[in-house]
UniProtKB/Swiss-Prot annotation:
CDD domains: TS_Pyrimidine_HMase. This is Thymidylate synthase. Catalyzes the reductive methylation of 2'-deoxyuridine-5'-monophosphate (dUMP) to 2'-deoxythymidine-5'-monophosphate (dTMP) while utilizing 5,10-methylenetetrahydrofolate (mTHF) as the methyl donor and reductant in the reaction, yielding dihydrofolate (DHF) as a by-product. This enzymatic reaction provides an intracellular de novo source of dTMP, an essential precursor for DNA biosynthesis. Disulfide bonds: none annotated. It is found in: Cytoplasm.
């Protein structure tokens, strides 16, 4: 995961200090891209331990189209609690936009079902896109989408994915996003009969919060280790049929967790 360490180093050396919505302050750069070959191992950070359970359940929650944290809490995942209202609702966030984008004529568009179908029918299409950024709904969301658009690409029997992330909390959020979209790419590849290719991560405002700088410097002192392997149950043939038990992360040997506060 040298790509991630290079990003940390670039922000620490070149970042501009900026004010932000949370009042915490950031060091920020604009425009950065990382590429991960999924055949070379699953891109899960090894220089600090990440919670696989939270990553997988959040992705399954998105794919269910849910926008209430009830499912997450039932599975011991609290990463969205800070933004939920008293009833656990978040407004029309990722799951709603992915699975039930409201069309002007009253229809509901299932972008995930559509893109999986299109990969099978028209793999060379340049329209294999899912967007979570709906300007009509942004003001209704507890937190507008940070990872807001992704595109699939098929070549030589392999499925690749590029994510555009408008706002990237590099210490806490980006490691989750890398693993989540790498896993999504593997899942979609399996159900469309393809092999995983690359995950390409394009960042807009990539920032370290000022209260994460010491943690980032600590992480950079740790040598990277071999990437783990992600095994997915080959019997699952629908993108909506995956369960937590269908994923097995093997040979994950990370350095210890590094605690940092979430900027809300």
């Amino acid at each position: 995961m040298n790509q991630y360490h290079d990003l940390l180093e670039r922000i620490l050396s070149d970042g501009a200090e900026k004010h932000d919505r949370t009042g915490t302050g950031t060091l920020s750069i604009f425009g950065h891209q990382m590429r991960f070959n999924l055949a070379s191992g699953f891109p899960m950070l090894t220089t600090k331990k990440l919670p696989l359970k939270s990553i997988v359940h959040e992705l399954l929650w998105f794919l269910k189209g849910e926008t209430n944290v009830r499912y997450l809490r039932e599975h011991g995942v609290s990463i969205w609690d800070e933004w939920a209202d008293a009833n656990g609702d978040l407004g029309p966030v990722y799951g709603s936009q992915w699975r039930s984008w409201p069309a002007p004529d009253g229809r509901s568009i299932d972008q995930i079902a559509n893109v999986v179908d299109m990969i099978g029918r028209s793999p060379d299409s340049r329209r294999l896109i899912v967007s979570a950024w709906n300007p009509a709904d942004v003001d209704k969301m507890a937190l507008p989408p940070c990872h807001c658009l992704f595109q699939f690409y098929v070549a030589d029997g392999k499925l690749s994915c590029q994510l555009y992330q408008r706002s990237a909390d590099v210490f806490l959020g980006v490691p989750f996003n890398i693993a989540s979209y790498a896993l999504l790419t593997m899942m979609v590849a399996q159900v469309t009969g393809l092999k995983p290719g690359d995950f390409v991560h394009s960042l807009g405002d990539a920032h370290l919060y000022l209260n994460h700088l010491d943690q980032a410097r600590l992480q950079l002192t740790r040598p990277t280790r071999s990437l783990p392997t992600m095994t997915i149950n080959p019997e699952v043939k629908s993108i909506f049929a995956f369960r937590y038990e269908d994923f097995k992360l093997e040979n994950y040997d990370p350095h210890p967790h590094i605690k940092a506060e979430v900027a809300v």
